Each structure stands twice: as C-alpha cells, then as structure tokens.
Amino acid sequence: MMKRETFKIADIYVPVKRRATLNPSTVQQLAQDMLQNGQKSPILVRRDGDRFVLVEGLHRLEACKALGEETILGYLVQAAKH
C-alpha cells in the first residue's frame, strides 16, 4: 500500500505536454471545493533527481497554488518517463 506524503509544490515539475491540458474553470471549481473540504485526492509524482515530476493531478496542483498553499498531499510512484 502506498503511503501518502506531503510534497513542496515548488519541488514539483509539470511537463509541458501536461500543462497544455489545463482548464482554468476546473482549477477554480477545485479551489472552491478545497477551501470547504480540503484536498480529497492526493496527486501522483515520480522522482527525477532532486525534483518530482507530476504524473497525475494537474488541476489539484494548480488549485493548491491558486489558494497560496506551499505543500500538497501526494503519492510517490514508480512511473516511466513519457
């Protein structure tokens, strides 16, 4: 079973291809939900040297950024580079 961890948002790299799928209205809706209910679903990241690369959870990550958060809940996974 994976262990949920807290990651510094500044240490998470978002690949360019993944950034292209960003929907600002989804980010806004998630940010509102997170204000009321907290972060429900952790993101997925993989290690790449000294940083982490986002695997899943772009909108959750951006919602946390919009709320001024410095950390986010996530799981560290073993994933192939795309």
Each model region followed by its residue ranges:
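Short, charged recognition helix plus adjacent turn
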Residues: K81-H82
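Short, charged/polar connector segments at secondary-structure boundaries
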Residues: M1-Q78
